[in-house]
Amino acid sequence: MQHRLTHPRIHALEAALASRPPLRAPAVAGQAQAAVALLLRVHQGRVELMLIRRAEREGDPWSGHMALPGGRAQADDAGMAATAARETREEVGVDVATGRLLGALDDLAPRSAAIPSIVVSPFVFHVPENVEVRLNHEVQLALWIAVDELLQGDAVTEYLHDLADGNTLRFPAFDARGYVVWGMTHRILTGFLELYAQTGAPEASE
């Protein structure tokens, strides 16, 4: 089922995504592939984005991080968009088939050598406002936040990572209602927000 587009920002975002084909990373032997979903809904006249907090899991480099629904590709996935759809259904119970695929963002890879070699493909979906969310064991919480909140100056912050040698690394981050979004998710959101900001003026809450 294709969910009807009812918000001008959604229309404009779909057009903006269509106007700029995403940059795809060349295939590298042995490199893992993954996909994430930027789930958008319209609530009280504002476009909102779903963020999740991953459960604490030993051995998971993204344990406890704020993130987007998604995960690694499987051999039977019919492309990376299908990977994003399957992982979203498994992690948060949302079937993106009830909505619409708006487009894709550029592929990204981790910048840290401590993270496994992987390429992540982000996809943007519009889903119904009343979509049901059911978290599995991999996800601690799901949060809907107005996209325009992330565009405000006070959402810009830093994540401080303390090293064993006593030094501290600083990473650019977003403050999403008290939850710090950094790393690859911050990079994905930065690219998305740059595009979204071009689609219209900020929305007033109702």
Q: Where are the predicted features?
A:
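N-terminal leader/linker segments that precede catalytic domains of diphosphate-processing enzymes
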Residues: 1-67, 72-131, 148, 163, ...
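Short, charged, solvent-exposed linker or helix-capping segments at domain edges/interfaces
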Residues: 133-137, 154-155
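Acidic, glycine-rich loop-and-strand cores that form catalytic or ligand-binding grooves
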Residues: 135-149
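A mid-sequence, solvent-exposed acidic-amphipathic segment
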Residues: 150-158
